[in-house]
Swiss-Prot record:
UniProt keyword terms in alphabetical order: Aminoacyl-tRNA synthetase, ATP-binding, Cytoplasm, Ligase, Nucleotide-binding, Protein biosynthesis
Family per similarity comment: Belongs to the class-II aminoacyl-tRNA synthetase family. ProS type 1 subfamily.
Predominant localisation class: cytoplasm
Record-listed E.C. numbers: 6.1.1.15
MF (Gene Ontology): aminoacyl-tRNA deacylase activity; ATP binding; proline-tRNA ligase activity
Lineage: Bacteria, Pseudomonadati, Thermodesulfobacteriota, Desulfobulbia, Desulfobulbales
Ranges in a coiled coil: none
Species of the source: Desulfotalea psychrophila (strain LSv54 / DSM 12343)
PROSITE patterns attached to this UniProt entry: AA_TRNA_LIGASE_II (PS50862)
Protein name, UniProt field: Proline--tRNA ligase
Assembly and oligomerization: Homodimer.
Reactions accelerated catalytically: tRNA(Pro) + L-proline + ATP = L-prolyl-tRNA(Pro) + AMP + diphosphate
């Protein structure tokens, strides 16, 4: 492509609205333009990058035996009501009525639609297994869209759905997709980790997220320094370290703590550590107030709590709501004779003679012991992981790092097929529900994540597999017939070698051409300028590390073709 004929509207200044590097650089490099909050138009250069990801995804999905199809973005509400998700999904699901007063929604996922298709078309175990996928625009009405394509309302997604006869076969389908995802993100040139994850609104028994490692990632992930264990914060397990504690149970004692409400203030006043104190935090769970006990230096992981209670959502109650539910001001609440349900983190159950709120203003209790003094309805791992906690798998040290979720795979089981009465006949003639899995990749988010992981102060540094153009040829002598002829010849030879090439034939200063080449992140720059007349050489520069070589035009095309092919097959 000739730059003079291309629509790549670059910007010198960083737009004020852009907070993270990928958003800033995508706007500056002419990838996209904002239409409304969280909604963008993809310009040719940005769309080319998205198409590169799509092609890799498509090749690997087909290689894994999945078949591509396309489903409508608008979905009838009745399908979602069959599974109960129409009410559960929340305001992120955009709902509307058509002129005939039929209720519909814009699909953020397509479990209901694909299950409806399969229940009407497949009826025998002989039809299975099957895996169907699409690459399509989705819409999710995010409350606070931000970071460009990282958290937009409209996005490009690949979603696949597998149907199997039993759990054993469904596990094989899941494993096949898991391996396909590893190949996809490896081919995209990304540093990533698969992590154990909570299934969230999609549902199911088991899932993994694929996280691109980046400092600007919105998600915190937990990884072991000594083994392959990795999980997101919501799913990360805490290994309870067994400790011998022969301490005798001391007598319960009420102590005055005037005006001391916060953990640190109480600890300073009583000259104890937070590890000797248990916090009582009150959450609303489907309209019920539930007290949660965690050690004084810990925080509650809300997803773990939600899963324990079996509710759709939990929310920490404010001071007034806590007082209305318990009659105790926040900061002095404790689990002894509390009038609401109590659940406890497993760590609390092995503590002895600890401190809690006294359920009376300005008082705490000393020498509390769970089994003697409290009524606890359930115990589970409810706390957030901390750096250097022991790994639940090998006992090594855990560390926290940031990541960007680009893919998610789920074992759905029979939840959707049973609620929608989607069944097949097995080999004995019995009717059974399909065992399902679903598998998503945020295609447009992959591009943003790649930029977050690959950029510098001058612009994007595209991995070769995702670059809209792998080579840019800079003609620095438009008025010099020899330079122009050499640039044109190289442009033609590189294209003939199967490379995607941008010929910068604009009437611009050399400095402007260099800056745009760096901003756009094109992996290789081939400069044809004064060096050609001086010593018969052109300059080849690698964007990633700035490595530069001079060579003859005859050598340059073959050299670049070999370099790029090597990076595509690494």
């Amino acid at each position: 492509m000739r730059y003079s004929q291309s629509f790549i509207p670059t910007k010198k200044e960083t737009p004020a609205e852009a907070e993270v590097a990928s958003h800033q650089l995508m706007l500056r490099a002419g990838f996209m333009r904002k239409l409304s909050s969280g909604v963008y138009s993809y310009l040719p250069y940005g769309l080319a990058a998205i198409r590169k990801v799509e092609n890799i995804v498509r090749e690997e999905m087909n290689r894994a035996g999945a078949q591509e199809m396309l489903m409508p973005m608008v979905q009838p509400a009745d399908l979602w009501k069959e599974t109960g998700r129409y009410e559960k999904y929340g305001p992120e699901l955009l709902r509307f009525f058509d002129r005939n007063n039929r209720e519909s929604c814009l699909g953020p996922t397509h479990e209901e639609v694909i299950t409806d298709i399969v229940r009407n078309e497949l009826s025998s175990y002989r039809d299975l297994p099957i895996n169907l996928y699409q690459i399509q625009t989705k819409f999710r009405d995010e409350i606070r869209p931000r970071f460009g394509l990282m958290r937009g309302r409209e996005f490009v997604m690949k979603d696949a759905y597998s149907f199997d006869v039993d759990d054993e076969q469904a596990n094989l389908s899941y494993d096949k997709m898991f391996e396909a995802y590893k190949r996809i993100f490896t081919r995209c040139g990304l540093q990533f980790r698969p992590v154990q994850a909570d299934s969230g609104a999609i549902g199911g028994s088991h899932s993994h997220e694929f996280m691109v490692l980046a400092k600007t990632g919105e998600d915190t992930i937990v990884v072991c320094k000594d083994c392959e264990y990795a999980a997101n914060m919501e799913k990360a397990e805490v290994k309870l370290v067994a400790t011998e504690n022969d301490e005798a149970l001391a007598e319960l004692e009420k102590i005055e703590t005037p005006g001391k409400r916060k953990v640190n203030a109480v600890c300073d006043f009583l000259q104890i550590t937070p590890q000797q104190l248990v916090k009582t935090m009150v959450f609303e769970a489907d309209g019920e107030a539930v007290a949660v006990l965690v050690r004084g230096d810990r925080e509650v992981e809300e997803v773990k709590l939600k899963n324990l209670l079996g509710v759709a959502d939990v929310e920490l109650m404010d001071d007034k709501a806590v007082f209305d539910a318990t009659g105790v001001p926040t900061g002095y609440l404790g689990p002894v004779a509390i009038p609401i349900r109590v659940v406890a983190d497993q760590e609390v159950m092995v503590m002895k003679n600890f401190y809690v709120g006294g359920n009376e203003k300005n008082f705490h209790l000393k020498n509390v012991n769970i089994e003697r003094d409290c009524t606890v309805s359930a115990v589970a791992d409810l706390r957030q992981i901390s750096t250097d906690d022991p790994c639940p798998r090998c006992g090594g040290r855990l560390e926290l790092t940031e990541g960007i979720e680009v893919g998610h795979v789920f074992k759905l089981g029979t939840g959707y097929s049973e609620s929608m009465n989607a069944r097949f006949q097995d080999g004995t003639g019995d009717e059974k529900p399909f065992v399902m899995g679903c598998y998503g990749i945020g295609v447009s988010r992959v591009v943003a994540a790649a930029i977050e992981q690959n950029h510098d102060k001058d612009g994007i540094i595209f991995p070769v597999p995702l670059a809209p153009y792998t080579v840019t040829v800079l003609n620095l002598g438009l008025k010099d017939p020899e330079i122009t002829a050499a640039a044109e010849k190289l442009y033609a030879e590189l294209q003939a070698a199967g490379l995607s090439v941008l010929l910068d034939d604009r009437d611009e200063r050399p400095g402007a051409k260099f800056k745009d080449a760096d901003l756009l992140g094109i992996p290789y720059r081939l400069t044809v300028g004064k060096g050609l007349a001086k010593n018969g050489m052109v300059e080849v520069r690698r964007r990633r590390d700035g490595h530069t070589e001079e060579m003859t035009p005859e050598v340059a095309a073959d050299f670049l073709a070999r370099c790029i092919q090597a990076e595509l097959t690494d």
